[in-house]
């Protein structure tokens, strides 16, 4: 029997991967209830960009998620905090998303602090890291993590979309979509070809992602829009609970 692909392999292979938002203080029973509403969910998501960040709470949620064998997606607080990615990963998330990514410097710094040596420079430590209980040996764990964890960069402006070929690099698994801030940016640049509509910008980004070898992640929120964005080329989705 073929081995089931892990999270990173699944995303890299273009297998549709669907996440669902959960409260940052969700209990085990709450997470179980949300996951029970749709058997298509592959990960849960919490956000700190627009919500308070309480690290012990994030750690507790990650521990519960590990008990349920469900990966945690975590959007970090700010673009300029990429240097803290390793610290947050030590708490237990499996997926990191960097908001408002615009530059190659941000993309590379995210890669550097996401991966262990020799590919990155993430520091060793963290008692609740995902998978650490099964892999206490340093070389075993670091090799495993570098082939398991998922790194996403969020594009939220026309310039960021144009920059996707420069943001995409080894170690970046997906480009995620930021429709709200992008909408504001489109309004400021009404004559740019990508300002026509969100769908027009998505279609452009989908092609660029395909050409550069990264996957496209869309926050569709409403599960009824799932197929629409899959048809547009997104292979990773994030939804509100049903």
Give the positions of each predicted feature:
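Structural preference for beta-strand elements that scaffold enzyme active sites
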Residues: 15-19, 42-43, 69-73, 94-97, ...
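Active-site mouth loops of central-metabolism enzymes
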Residues: 11-29, 73-78, 149-162, 215-222
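Conserved N-terminal beta1-alpha1 strand-loop-helix module at the mouth
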Residues: 1-72, 79, 169
């Amino acid at each position: 029997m073929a081995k089931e692909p892990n999270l990173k392999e699944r995303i890299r292979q273009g297998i549709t991967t669907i996440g669902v938002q959960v409260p940052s203080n969700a209990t085990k029973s709450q997470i179980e209830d949300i996951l029970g509403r749709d058997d298509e969910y592959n990960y849960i998501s919490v956000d700190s960009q627009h919500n308070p960040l309480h690290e012990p709470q994030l750690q507790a949620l990650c521990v519960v998620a590990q008990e349920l064998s469900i990966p945690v997606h975590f959007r970090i607080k700010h673009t300029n905090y990429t240097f803290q990615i390793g610290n947050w990963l030590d708490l237990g998330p499996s997926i990191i998303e960097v908001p408002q990514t615009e530059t190659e410097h941000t993309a590379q710094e995210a890669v550097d602090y996401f991966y262990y040596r020799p590919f990155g420079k993430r520091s060793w430590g963290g008692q609740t890291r995902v998978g650490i209980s099964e892999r206490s040996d340093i070389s075993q764990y670091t090799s495993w993590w570098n082939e398991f964890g998922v790194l996403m960069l969020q594009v939220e402006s026309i310039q960021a979309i144009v920059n996707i070929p420069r943001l995409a690099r080894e170690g970046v698994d997906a480009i995620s979509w930021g429709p709200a801030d992008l909408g504001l940016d489109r309004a400021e640049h009404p004559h740019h070809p990508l300002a026509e509509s969100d769908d027009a910008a998505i279609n452009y980004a989908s092609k660029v992602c395909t050409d550069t070898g990264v996957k496209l992640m869309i926050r569709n929120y409403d599960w009824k829009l799932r197929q629409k964005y899959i048809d547009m080329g997104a292979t990773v989705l994030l939804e509100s609970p049903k």
